[in-house]
């Protein structure tokens, strides 16, 4: 079943279409091709030199090493592809923010042009009003002159001339009134259009400003959520993600190696304590199943329980077996290095939050109480200094 699952993962990776493969950078392509070649060569090696029938007769830790050698590059490739997509999404958001800022500049230019247009309209309206005032002044002057001319005519009794002159003045006043009304209506329409255009431009600028703030905030959140290790000022998001990937690869390899070492120590200890190799094999198989189900600390917890509950038997096993001493020394030294690496991170970094004070810390503490840094057992009541901080 495990081999079938691995083959399914390989086929899934090979099933990428050409468009998706073309979007990957050179490093991601090389990692993907390398992982596929690694998986194929591993399967060919198992088929030719080991045989599928002999695969399930291996010891649990040997079977685990075979699975790990096949699945590890595939898992690293999936991680690299995910990080590449994150970098692309961050770059896309940055380009959108840059484009939006350029659009804001063009909108400001449009507003300036519209303001100049409004200024020209106001000047034209002022000129028309001034001309209308001049025409009204001339009308008043003509009216006064007409009255001055009408006075002698009225005294001489010429009613017909007075009637014609009054009709002429009335028609002129009606024409002027109609012109003033049309001018007032046109001015009101221009003011309304100006107000509507101004409100529309203001609303558009506000919406663009809000959109720019939302995109900037989302970009900041993505950058902060992907920041793992403390980096010097001036690093862009892609460099921060590269640091996170490097740290994750180092810690992942170290923890996988520690899990295999803990499995070997457990196997030697249980065989020496109980003498039941079949029972030990079933127990290790159960732990391996739990490990592949997602419990990556199951070997650490089991070894902690043995170090706490059967410390004397574990020390005797290490005293009698050189390989057990070397494996315990390896666990202590690697755990110390991992703890130092995690302690160098910022207290708010994701790596430190995940790994600090975990099962590996408990395993280091339990073993340091009964063993020196070189794996030698301590038989005194007071545990000596093992070189740990």
Curated annotation (Swiss-Prot):
The chain crosses the membrane at residues 32-52, 63-83. It comes from the Bacteria. The keyword Membrane applies. One of its GO terms (cellular component) is magnetosome membrane. It is found in: Magnetosome membrane. GO terms for molecular function: lipid binding. Disruption phenotype: No growth phenotype, retains a magnetic response. Magnetosome vesicles are slightly bigger than wild-type while magnetite crystals are equal in number but have a much wider size range. The keyword Transport does not apply. This bacteria makes up to 20 cubo-octahedral magnetosomes of about 45 nm in diameter which contain membrane-bound crystals of magnetite (Fe(3)O(4)). Causes tubulation when added to magnetosome-derived liposomes, binds liposomes; may be involved in constriction of the cell inner membrane to form mature magnetosomes. Binds preferentially to cardiolipin, a component of bacterial membranes, with very poor to no binding of other tested (phospho)lipids. Addition of cardiolipin to magnetosome-derived lipids increases tubulation. May function with MamX, MamZ amd Mms6. Belongs to the magnetosome MamY family. This is Liposome tubulation protein MamY.
